[in-house]
C-alpha cells in the first residue's frame, strides 16, 4: 500500500553496514510473502548472507543523512542498551545528528483544522535527548521516517542546505495486548548546517507537520497488519504516533523553552536578583541576534562574486580643434555667421565660402528671379572662445561683436528693390547667363556654373546674354542717340575667349563722339569695375586675357585717344541710321 520497506544498505557508498539490516516483516506497506513458501524456507533465507541492495536511484547526501538517523534508531530498539547507559547513548545520538543551535518544531493537527489553530510544539537543542528517550520510555519500541515521493533541495543565503518532502510517513510500533503500528502522514522540512568534515551534515532546524494518522494491529493468524477498530475504552492510546506522556513532555518543554536562558543565568549566579537576571538575558540575546545578522551578511557577500575593479578614467587632454580655414579662422567664423543670418532672414548666403557652388557635395541651387539681394548695415561676428572643450553648462566665453559694413549703401538698396541698380539687372539675368549659350556653338559638356574668377562673371550682363535686349532700338539718355538692338545681339557669347570680341562687333566704323559719355544710370554700364556682382572679388580684365594679349602696351595713341577708347578696324563701314557712339553704351569695354 505504501511501497517497499526501506532497505538501509551502503551499496552505493563503499562501506558495508556495521550491523544487520532490519528484519523483514509482513507489514501492510512491505512486500507480501511469496506464495508456496513456508516458515522453514524463510528461516533458511534469513540465515544466508545477502549483499545490501541499493535504494533505487542515487541518494543525495541530505536524504542519506535521514536514512542514517533511521538506522541508528533501529539499532537502539533492536540492541539491548542498559538503563544506565541510555542517557549517554541519546546524548551521543543528538550530538551526531543535530547541531548545537538546533530546534525541533512539531505542528500537529488534522487537515480540516486551520493551520493557525493547530498545536505547535518547540523542542530546544538541550531537550532533544530527553524527547527521543521519552518516546521509547512511553512504550514505543520502534521509530522511523520513510521518505516517499519527490523531494526538493536548495542552498540558502546563509550557506545552509534545505531539504523538503511533502509526503513523509512516520512509523511507530508499540506492544500492549498485541502489536500495533501507527502510520502518520506529514510534511517534512529540514535545514542542514554547512558540511563539516568530522560531523558531516547536521540538522539545524527540523519542522514536521503531522496531518492524519492510521493505526493497524498485527493479526497472528494471517501474519499481517489490519486496520484496528476504534476502541474508546483503551486508556493509553497514541495520538499522531505519540503517547500521552510524550505530549505532556512536549507541552512542558514549550513552556520552559523561553525560560531556559533565564534559568541558566540564575543557576550560574544565585546572588543576583531575578530582575537583574532578566536584564542580562535580554542583553545576551540581543548580542547573539546581532552576531547572527552579521554572519548572514558575511555569507551573502561571500556568495556574491566581487565586482571587477573599475579602471581609472584617463586624464582628459583639452585639445583645440583645427580651424576649418587655416589661413584665417576669424574670416571663416564671420562668413559662417553671415550665412546663418542670411538664411534666417530668407536670403541665400552671399559669402563665397558659404556658397554651395564652392562645395562639391551640395547640388547646385540657382537663385530664382523673385529674390532680391540685400545688404546689411552691420555684420554679426562670433569670436573664437578662449577655452575649447568645455562641457555644457560651464563657462563658454564666446564673444559676439558687431562690425560695421563699410560697403552698405541705402540708396543702392532702394534701387535694387526697384530693379534700377546695376547689380539687380545683372543678378536677375545671371540665371539666364548660366543656362543659355550661343546658337552657333555647342554648350560645354558638364559645365553648369562658372567659377567666380572666370571672365564670364566679370563681364556685364549685356555681353553674356545676347538675347536679353528687346526688339527694336534702345532709347538713349542725356541726348545720346538710340542704339539699335542688333548691336547688343552681336556681342560675343559667354564662353568665347576674350580676343574674339572684335569679330562680333558691327562692321561699320564711326569716329568716336567726343564729350558724350553714357549716364551712370544706364543699364549695362559699369559704374564701378569692382562691383561686377555681389560677393565677387574684383578682377582686372588683363588677368583673364591670354598670355599673348596681356603684355604691357602703351595706353595712349598719338591722337590723344586712349587705346581702350579706339573703335575696331571695321567700325567705319557703318551705313544707315543715325551715327552711333563709341564706345557703345551697352558694351563691355572697360574704361581706364
Curated annotation (Swiss-Prot):
Polar residues compositional bias, start-end: 23-41, 352-368
Tissue-specific expression: Expressed in all neurons and some other tissues of the adult, including vulval muscle, and, in males, all the neurons of the tail region. Expressed in vulval cells.
Sequence ranges of Low complexity compositional bias: 322-344
Annotated region (Disordered), positions in chain: 14-41, 305-368, 437-458, 559-592
Cross-referenced InterPro entries: LID (IPR041363), LIM-bd/SEUSS (IPR029005)
Pfam families, sorted: LID, LIM_bind
All residue ranges annotated as the LIM interaction domain (LID) domain in the record: 378-417
Lineage, opening ranks: Eukaryota, Metazoa, Ecdysozoa, Nematoda, Chromadorea
Family stated for the protein in its record: Belongs to the LDB family.
One term of GO molecular function: DNA-binding transcription factor activity
Self-association and partners: Interacts with blmp-1.
The protein, known as: LIM domain-binding protein 1
Record note on disruption phenotype: RNAi-mediated knockdown causes mechanosensory defects and uncoordination in L1 and L2 larval stage animals; phenotypes become weaker in later stages and eventually disappear in young adults. RNAi-mediated knockdown causes defects in vulval morphology and gonad arms. RNAi-mediated knockdown reduces the level of bed-3 and col-124 mRNAs and increases the level of lin-29 mRNA.
GO cellular component: nucleus; transcription regulator complex
Entry-linked PROSITE patterns: LID
Function, in words: Binds to the LIM domain of LIM domain-containing transcription factors. Required for the blmp-1-mediated transcriptional activation or repression of several hypodermal genes, such as bed-3. Regulates sam-10 nuclear localization in PLM neurons. Has a role in synaptic differentiation of PLM mechanosensory neurons. Involved in gonadogenesis.
BP GO terms, sorted: locomotion; mechanosensory behavior; negative regulation of transcription by RNA polymerase II; nervous system development; positive regulation of transcription by RNA polymerase II; positive regulation of vulval development; protein localization to nucleus; synapse assembly
Protein source organism: Caenorhabditis elegans
Pro residues bias (residue ranges): 577-586
Transmembrane residue ranges: none
